[in-house]
Amino acid sequence: VTGAGSGIARAVTLEALRRGARVAAVDLNTTTLEETTTLAAADGAVSTHVLNLADRAPVEALPAQVIARQGAVDGLVHCAGIIQPFAKLEDLEYDAIERVFAVNWWGTLFLNKTFLPQLLARPEGHIVNVASMGGFLPVPGQTIYGASKAAVKLLTEGLHSECAGTNVHVTAVFPGAVATNITVNSRVTIPIDDATAAAQT
């Protein structure tokens, strides 16, 4: 489970453990990942793996690490993702654009391509990629984020077609507005107008 240090991925991790699964919890943030394992109190059923999903080499090394700790890989639940600074395209720096695509697009591609052979070798496997409703309709100030999630959507749908007739199932999930730490994790602040600010004070 990627992004397991917070949000949807933390909830998925805890629920999977509650149901008796063994989970490899993946995140960039060591502190929040440790918080998840503390909440889990899973007595060895969860292993933690700290890495940057935008870096291909560590991702390619991940299956062997997970198998060494867990024995096998039967599923990938890819939740990790970030948003962009709330700004129009013309006002965005290329660094911000590239960072969103590095995590949301390349991270997804690296994980899916790396874990697919492991899953095809199992009796049954499942890939779940978390996209976003923002991949269907534009969200104000999130054009690049939406484009990255639209790419995740199409990749997942294409992989679903490619895996038809195999032992691997592929699913895309499209959350709407969910209370998570994505703004903090993305190092982004949400702009609020003066009236909203006054109402909050």
Residue ranges of model-derived segments:
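Active-site helix of classical SDR
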Residues: 112, 148
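Residue(s) in the substrate-gating loop at a strand-loop-helix junction
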Residues: 132
